[in-house]
């Protein structure tokens, strides 16, 4: 699923959220950044951690929005949380396989600064992304907890959907021996 196949609402939703967190660049520049993210989420090596995963996570953030402090910051963190991805064997062995939250946060920082998002907000987005790697947070960080719930919501599904998740994940890493 690339830019052409992405739902029509997806790119405008990205632009709205980035504007809502303080971006000063025009909508066209924000849209270009969103198109690049859609391309990153749509590479052929992503069998599970793809645009569908991003859309599902955004939907779960929307479900939790009333319980959060800043859902737009959470939405932007969703967009960037897995924008750097590798299923390379060496990356997997080093613990950076799949969605590389640390590299994704660095990408987000550069991109959001370029879009004119205030530095304090950029740091918050990046901290939410990095925290997804550990899934361990302070009890008083509601937005971080909600974002983790949105990310791990993949596991809280019916058995058939979970079976499909496992199948796609195995495809994503089919070049790595199971044992």
Labelled PLM ranges:
Residues 26, 30-36, 67, 98-101, ...:
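Short catalytic/metal-binding and nucleic-acid-binding patches
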Residues 30, 69-76, 115-130:
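Acidic/histidine metal-binding catalytic segments
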Residues 31-60, 83-95:
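Active-site flanking loop/helix segments enriched in acidic
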Residues 57, 72-90, 104, 126-133:
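His-Asp-centered metal-binding catalytic motifs of divalent-metal-dependent phosphohydrolases/nucleases
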Residues 57, 98-115:
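An active-site-proximal "capping" alpha-helix that borders the catalytic cofactor pocket
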Residues 92-99, 103-106, 172-179:
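Divalent-cation-assisted or electrostatically stabilized phosphate/pyrophosphate-binding catalytic cores
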């Amino acid at each position: 699923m690339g830019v052409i196949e992405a739902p029509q609402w997806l790119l405008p939703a990205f632009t709205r959220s980035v504007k809502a967190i303080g971006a000063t660049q025009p909508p066209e520049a924000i849209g270009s950044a969103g198109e690049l993210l859609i391309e990153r989420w749509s590479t052929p090596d992503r069998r599970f951690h793809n645009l569908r995963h991003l859309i599902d996570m955004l939907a779960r953030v929307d479900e939790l929005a009333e319980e959060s402090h800043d859902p737009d910051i959470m939405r932007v963190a969703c967009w960037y949380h897995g924008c750097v991805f590798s299923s390379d064997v060496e990356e997997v062995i080093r613990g950076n396989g799949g969605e590389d939250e640390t590299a994704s946060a660095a990408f987000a920082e550069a991109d959001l600064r370029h879009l004119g998002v205030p530095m304090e907000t950029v740091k918050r987005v990046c901290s939410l992304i990095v925290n997804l790697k550990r899934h361990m947070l302070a009890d008083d960080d509601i937005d971080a907890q909600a974002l983790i719930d949105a990310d791990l919501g993949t596991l809280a599904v019916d058995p058939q959907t979970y079976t499909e998740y496992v199948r796609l994940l195995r495809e994503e890493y089919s070049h790595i021996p199971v044992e």
